[in-house]
């Protein structure tokens, strides 16, 4: 499969770059098209792909590029599902897949996949699961997926008997055909990220596709507390197992402050360093996954008790003059900001705002009890300020995050928490939200004189 074919890759980025290299190695004729001009692409990637024989088309999507001579269209996850090439490919009966599906079909026999999806908590759960599995089984465990490592990038290092821990996004799920994990995990479903998918039903369907590809020999680990997850997964064929932070169930659950796995105490949540009940749930999901491979409680405790979180996700930055600073730039929706605010019981100052998307900030009100001030930033800052005043909170309005730090010295006191949890995307001012988080962290380091 994928030998001596003519293939169009739509979208460069990490996945397009890695897919192109794999396909060229296998003797395919490869075209890669990206709307961005060449001078805005990664020059090293472009040079390498051109040198190995990839036909590169940048700056537009020419109407005559895609025709019936192509055998496959491989779509980058960020490309809309109604893109003209996608629609034309379907008219011409050209299979439309993604990089994950392609790489999955090229994996050696006997490779297990732990696939983790959901609206929130995917990256944290994937990272914890990988670190536990790697501690237990060493280099036979690999990390891949929507966490910065395309599946095709690890093909040459994976052997039969190895295990891949993958984060899977809804955009990837859109073009799954056969892909499925042996152990699948759903952290939760909510309507936070549906803009790419148009409707919530479509969003859930794409998230669920890999589970509907499973057989009764596979495992689906589900959040028992999330009714949308339970409803969406009610007809899957795989063996369903559950975790719950709210009630004692047959699976992984809490009693007082202890996590149990089918009646066996695994650890106390006081030993989990990352903040919030949502992170307890992420740990529980990871426990369920690794227990399918017989990992001991001792290994789980050793990894989890030393895990300090994923960068940019409620990440502890530092304490300066008794004030704790947290970088939660990945909180690009209301639900994530709710989770952040519920994680602290100290007086809190929150940086809130970013790209205007019509967010309903009123949904934050039940979580605002400990908030002493709001610093409104970004293109939606005036609407954030209006909301803050409506609930009687002090608010300070700045276009840019860095300017908000000038006010902090006047309003923080020892014992406070300052958190960047903007409930907004970053594209109004930043290429990606990680840049916003790095800027926040830099300002904290400057406060400390570093």
Regions found by a protein language model. Give the residues of each.
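Residue-level detector of alpha-helix initiation sites
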Residues: 14, 80, 120-124, 280, ...
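Phosphate-binding loop of NTP-binding sites
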Residues: 24-25, 63-70, 77-224, 228-238, ...
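Beta-strand->loop->alpha-helix junctions that form or flank phosphate-binding loops
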Residues: 59-60, 97-102, 237-255, 301-305, ...
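N-terminal leader/targeting and accessory segments in enzymes
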Residues: 1-98, 102
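Nucleotide phosphate-binding/pyrophosphate-handling subdomain across enzymes
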Residues: 3-6, 18-26, 110, 140, ...
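Short beta-strand "acidic-cap" motif of Rossmann-like dinucleotide-binding folds
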Residues: 30-34, 143, 165, 242, ...
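C-terminal helical cap/extension that packs against the catalytic core
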Residues: 46, 362-416
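Short internal beta-strands
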Residues: 29-37, 220-224, 351-352, 371-379
